[in-house]
Structures are given as structure tokens and as C-alpha cells.
Amino acid sequence: MARMGLAGAAGRWWGLALGLTAFFLPGVHSQVVQVNDSMYGFIGTDVVLHCSFANPLPSVKITQVTWQKSTNGSKQNVAIYNPSMGVSVLAPYRERVEFLRPSFTDGTIRLSRLELEDEGVYICEFATFPTGNRESQLNLTVMAKPTNWIEGTQAVLRAKKGQDDKVLVATCTSANGKPPSVVSWETRLKGEAEYQEIRNPNGTVTVISRYRLVPSREAHQQSLACIVNYHMDRFKESLTLNVQYEPEVTIEGFDGNWYLQRMDVKLTCKADANPPATEYHWTTLNGSLPKGVEAQNRTLFFKGPINYSLAGTYICEATNPIGTRSGQVEVNITEFPYTPSPPEHGRRAGPVPTAIIGGVAGSILLVLIVVGGIVVALRRRRHTFKGDYSTKKHVYGNGYSKAGIPQHHPPMAQNLQYPDDSDDEKKAGPLGGSSYEEEEEEEEGGGGGERKVGGPHPKYDEDAKRPYFTVDEAEARQDGYGDRTLGYQYDPEQLDLAENMVSQNDGSFISKKEWYV
């Protein structure tokens, strides 16, 4: 027993020594088995599992390549390549696994016709000497495409008045998918969907969705589509609902213009029903139909000319296998036909947008406001005094008329005749010349006795053209000319002053050509 213990201890030490030798041997860490980390494939398809040995050293000898599957913590051989023994594939892969390029550096295999049981962890192992075994593993996922379909309910859908309970109308199924698919609905209906997942023993999942709603007339002929999304695929299938409902009745034919003696009028009963209405019954609110009125199925004919006895409320009852509903119309008889007024030109041309009408009206209003403002401004400018309203600056005339405006006198004679006994002081001087004695004396005293005869004195000519005097100027002139006699001849050019003067509120006149500061 002691020998066996020593042998066991020696074996353990020898194994440890080999391991340390392999660990410190140069180039050991560069020897790597390369595989794909994960692979996936669909049931019934083929998948290639890559495996290669990288950077082999010349001193390292490869003896065997082995593929294994990890099952419940244990390893199960799948395929083996040995240079001396050849290729060996074990059951249940014998007919479905093959090496593509068997060699000491390439152990790639093909797994054909995938089954759900093929899913799992696969190990690729290279046996080397003296460094030992080198391996890597990959994960294979097997996917199953689901089978999808939609089916409507086998029960008859009937819309009933006052019904609030939702009933099953369609079922969408996505069966045996792996992983499970995503199911949804596409419709305008106001219903609700419920979902259920069933996990099958082989690992696949079946998804079932049921759609429920309250049957109604509005739901009839509406489309309901089932949408299944799986991996990169999208499935869509739809159906059209068939909902039975009782008739919805309307009466047509009365246009509001039934008048005396009108001919060839009728009423038609229209029933929206599923299945279609099979029976129609006409009555009036009073009971029986008037004389001259005949019912033929869904049409009510009025024979002969219209008279007042045909006025009243007419009722049509329509019946189908689901139920009976009625509709009514009130008929009025007038003495004369109603003739609508012809449409306006603008209406015939089409409605004018409100924005255009508002824009045109606003533009016209703006133009009127601007024109009115200009007119008011011009009138104020014409009738308003622009000068200084100080009490010191009153406006006087030029001494020959009130407020500075020359009066429109008839032309004066060139030579005025005075009696011989007239006072010399009252006689005017020669027309066209100066008539003031003091001015003559000033001219004689200061000007050497020379004076121009036959024309106005320059000073008086200048004063005559002035439209006004200030208060100071007026007082000064009153001192100098108060005792003198006017002998000035009117100049025709001064008559134009009246055309250029504007009347003021205080009775005075202001020239339009002057600005007063």
C-alpha cells in the first residue's frame, strides 16, 4: 500500500511537472483554437461550424481533431478526424455531419437539416503533443419559423339594439415559433384584443390573439387585419366582418316643391339592411293611404294631379330576418310652385374667399382714410393763420384799404379837374408822380432839385406792393402822413393781391404767398 501511495504521489508530481513545463514552454500561449462565438439557423436548413488551429509550432504535433456537444454537463462526441484512422461521425449525426477540409489546422464541419435537438454548446478540440489539448466552444441556436393564419368566428354576428357585450369576431394564430412571434391587429374597429402563449414540448411557442367587439351596423364590411412580426419577417392577413342588422329606413322623393296640379311624383323607401329587406309596407299617420296613391313594393306612386288631400305624413316599414324598422316623411302641398331666385353672378362664378373680401374692403377703407386726411390738411392749411398770434403783431394794410386789401375801384382818370377856387392843399399832385409836398421838399433839399416826373416814387411803389404793416410801422406812418391827401394812382398789378389773400376769423386778410414768423 505504501508503494501504491508513493506511485500515486509520483504520478501527481509528474503531471504537475509536465503542466509547468508546458506553461513555461515558449510559444504555448500562441496556440489558439478559433471558432465563432455563436451561430444560429432555422429548422431544416444547413449550418457551417468553423474551427481552426492558429500558429502551430513545428515542435508541436497534432494528433486528432474532435467535435463534441455539451449535454447536461457532459461531453458527447459528434465527429472525429484522426490522420491514421480517418473520419468518424457518431450517431445521431452520422448522416448529417461532414468535415469540409479535414487537416491538422482546419476542423470546420457542416451540420445539415437542422433539428430543434441540435441546439446547444459545441466544442472544437485539437489534441497536441507535448502541450496537451486545445479547445474552444460556440453556441448554436436553432430557430423555428411560425405558421400564421387568421380565421373569423363561426357564429353569426348580429347587431341588436341595446347590446353592450363584446363577442369574439376573429382569431389570429402564430404556431410553433422559436422564439415566439409578436402578434398585433390593424383595424378601424373599436374592439379589444387578448393574447395567449402556449409553450410546446419541443421548445417552440404558439401565440394566439382573439379580437372582440360589440356587433353594430357600422362594423359591417369593415376590415380586420392580423399582423405577425417574427425575426426579419412580417406577416399580414385580413378578413372582412359580416354583421347582420335590421333595416335603417329613409324615404326619398319629396323635394319640398309639391304644388297643385303637379304630375308624376312618387316616394321611394330605401332600407339599409343585412340581409336585405324583403318586405315593405306603406301607411300614413292617419292610417290608410289617400285616394289616388298606390304602393308597389318599396315605391309609392301618386296618380293624377296633386291636390291638398295628398298632404300628410307617410310611413314606410321595412322588414328583414333580423327585424322591422320604419321611416317617415311629411308632405306639404302648396298652391303655386316655388321658383328659386337665380343665383348671383358672384355665386355662379364660385364662392369668393373671405380673406379676399376682407382684404379688398380693408384696402378701400385705408385709401378713403388717407384721402380724407389729405383733404382736411389742405383745408386747414388754406384757412389757418400760420404766423405769430402775439397782440403786438396786428396786421395792417398798406394805407390804402382796410386790412391791406386794395379796393376794386373803377379806373381813375389821368387828369382830375378842380375848380379854380379850390384849395391848393386839397388838390392832388400830378398822377403818376409824388403827391406829398414834404417829399418834394426833401427831394429838392437833398437831391439837388432833380425829380423824376411821370412815374411813381420808388418808396411809394415799394410800399404799395407790401400787403401789410406791423403796429410799429403803422404808428410811424400815421405820424408822417396823417394830414396828407391821397393822390396815389392805383397800379393794376395791385388788383391781383385780392386773389392771393385769405380771410381770417378776426376779419383780417393774410397773403397766401407770405410766411409770417
From Swiss-Prot:
SUPFAM superfamilies according to UniProt: Immunoglobulin
Glycosylated residues in this chain: 36, 72, 139, 202, 286, 297, 307, 332
Effect of residue 133 to A: Does not affect interaction with herpes simplex virus 1/HHV-1 and herpes simplex virus 2/HHV-2 glycoprotein D. Impaired homophilic interaction in cis and cell adhsion activity
Result for mutant: residue 85 to A: Decreased interaction with herpes simplex virus 1/HHV-1, herpes simplex virus 2/HHV-2 and pseudorabies virus glycoprotein D, leading to decreased cell fusion with the virus
Leader sequence residues: 1-30
Annotated S-S bridges: 51-124, 172-226, 269-316
Source species, domain of life: Eukaryota
Mutation effect (residue 82 to Y): Impairs interaction with herpes simplex glycoprotein D. Decreases susceptibility to infection by herpes simplex virus
Topology, Extracellular side: 31-355
Segments of skewed composition (Basic and acidic residues): 449-466
Cytoplasmic topological domain residue ranges: 377-517
Residue ranges annotated for the Ig-like C2-type domain, each copy included: 149-238, 247-334
GO CC, alphabetical: adherens junction; apical junction complex; cell-cell contact zone; dendrite; extracellular region; growth cone membrane; hippocampal mossy fiber to CA3 synapse; membrane
Keywords tagged on the record: Cell adhesion, Cell junction, Cell membrane, Cell projection, Disease variant, Disulfide bond, Ectodermal dysplasia, Glycoprotein, Host cell receptor for virus entry, Host-virus interaction, Immunoglobulin domain, Membrane, Phosphoprotein, Receptor, Repeat, Secreted, Signal, Synapse, Transmembrane, Transmembrane helix, Ubl conjugation
Region Interaction with FGFR, residue ranges: 282-299
Record annotation: effect of changing residue 84 to Y: Impairs interaction with herpes simplex glycoprotein D. Decreases susceptibility to infection by herpes simplex virus
Effect of residue 82 to A: Does not affect interaction with herpes simplex virus 1/HHV-1 and herpes simplex virus 2/HHV-2 glycoprotein D
Subcellular location(s) of the protein: Cell membrane; Cell junction, Adherens junction; Presynaptic cell membrane
Feature: compositional bias, Acidic residues: 436-445
Phosphotyrosine: residues carrying this PTM: 436
Outcome reported for the amino acid change (mutating residue 64 to A): Does not affect interaction with herpes simplex virus 1/HHV-1 and herpes simplex virus 2/HHV-2 glycoprotein D
Its membrane topology: Single-pass type I membrane protein
TM regions (residue ranges): 356-376
Domain comment (free text): The Ig-like V-type domain is involved in homophilic interaction in cis, a prerequisite for cell adhesion. Ig-like C2-type 2 mediates neurite outgrowth through binding, induction of phosphorylation, and activation of FGFR.
Function per UniProt: Cell adhesion molecule that promotes cell-cell contacts and plays important roles in the development of the nervous system. Acts by forming homophilic or heterophilic trans-dimers. Heterophilic interactions have been detected between NECTIN1 and NECTIN3 and between NECTIN1 and NECTIN4. Involved in axon guidance by promoting contacts between the commissural axons and the floor plate cells. Involved in synaptogegesis. Has some neurite outgrowth-promoting activity.
Protein name (database record): Nectin-1
Source organism of this protein record: Homo sapiens (Human)
Species classification: Eukaryota, Metazoa, Chordata, Craniata, Vertebrata
